[in-house]
Structure formats: structure tokens, C-alpha cells
Amino acid sequence: MLERLKKSLLEAPVFKRGEYDYFIHPITDGVPEIRPDLIREVTANIVRIANLDVDKIVTVEAMGIPIGIVLSILCDIPLVIIRKRKYGLPNEVEISQVTGYSRSQLYLNGINRGDRVIVVDDVISTGGTLQATLDSMELAGAEVMDTVIVVERGNGAELLRSKGYNLKTMVRVKVEGGRVSEVEPGISK
């Protein structure tokens, strides 16, 4: 299961961004190309493991978008994209995002009090983006029914699980020696 994803991660190039070893992969970066068979495998697995009894799918710009769009089409559930640009719409929620290599603001629109949502994204490392996303759902009054992340690395997922969040991941990667050295099954319960 997830053989295409695992193989492609093991083949992913890695470069340094400051002190951070950053792997480049179609699901997490859209580079060199997002192949239909890979995105199909990933989204089919989300359908298999996720609670999709929800009103909306929520994802974060940029690389959560391909996953969210395909999942939205497969499941006929509307998609809300947390954006990097302020729109100034009523009830817009501003989110402070801190990742392993940057700080920025994100903006949530389209979530109403009482909405039942699933959060999907491409990767979790430090957990900063996901923590900000989950906090914004609470501020907006939404109920997060499930959270599914494709690639787990670092300790961010464990940190959020220790805070009581239900977080599913498909694979866990280890990056060392300038390459993705291990790809193990994630936690999908």
C-alpha cells in the first residue's frame, strides 16, 4: 500500500535551507510534476482512512490544494483553502504560522460556526502550520472531525497528538545524510 508514494519519497532530492534539510517531492512541492497515479494513490488512501462525514474539507495553500481538490471532487464535499493573502471578507480569521524555516500570516474564509470539517495537508514537520490551522478552526467555531497529513517528519505530529489532537499520517520519513533515508507507515487510526 502507498508503494508509489514510498518509492518517490526515497528518490526525492534533499537540499539545505538554513539548518533545515528540505526534501523536494511532487506531493509536498509540486516539483518536478504531480503524476495522476501518485495523487490518485494519496487521495484514495485518505478516502480509506478518514472520517468524511463532514461539511467541508480544509487545506492550506499551496501544496494542500492539489490534495484538497481531488478529494473534494471524489467525495463531492466543498473545499476551503487557507490562503497566504488577506481578502478582508467578513469573519476572516488571521492565522500566525511558524514553520521550521519561516514565519508568516495565513487567512481563513468560508468556515461557519458549527461546520464539521476535515483538515488535509501535504506534510507536517514542526507542527506549526497545523497547530495554527486547528486553532483557527476553533476560533471560527468549526468542529474538526479528522485530520490527515500525507507525510510526517520531525516531531510535530507527536507534539500535536500529545495535546489530544486526532492526527492521521500516511507515511513517516527520516531525512539524514542528504537524502530521505527511511519511509515508514504513518499512524492512520
From Swiss-Prot:
HAMAP family: Hypx_phosphoribosyltr. Catalyzes a salvage reaction resulting in the formation of IMP that is energically less costly than de novo synthesis. CDD domains: PRTases_typeI (cd06223). Pathway: Purine metabolism; IMP biosynthesis via salvage pathway; IMP from hypoxanthine: step 1/1. Belongs to the purine/pyrimidine phosphoribosyltransferase family. Archaeal HPRT subfamily. It is found in: Cytoplasm. GO terms for cellular component: cytoplasm. Keywords: Cytoplasm, Glycosyltransferase, Purine salvage, Transferase. It comes from the Archaea. It comes from Methanothrix soehngenii (strain ATCC 5969 / DSM 3671 / JCM 10134 / NBRC 103675 / OCM 69 / GP-6) (Methanosaeta concilii). One of its GO terms (biological process) is IMP salvage. Homodimer. SUPFAM superfamilies: PRTase-like (SSF53271). It catalyses: IMP + diphosphate = hypoxanthine + 5-phospho-alpha-D-ribose 1-diphosphate; GMP + diphosphate = guanine + 5-phospho-alpha-D-ribose 1-diphosphate. PROSITE patterns: PUR_PYR_PR_TRANSFER (PS00103). Its EC number is 2.4.2.8. The keyword Iron-sulfur does not apply. The keyword Iron does not apply. One of its GO terms (molecular function) is hypoxanthine phosphoribosyltransferase activity. This is Hypoxanthine/guanine phosphoribosyltransferase. It is an enzyme of class 2 (transferase). Gene3D superfamilies: 3.40.50.2020.
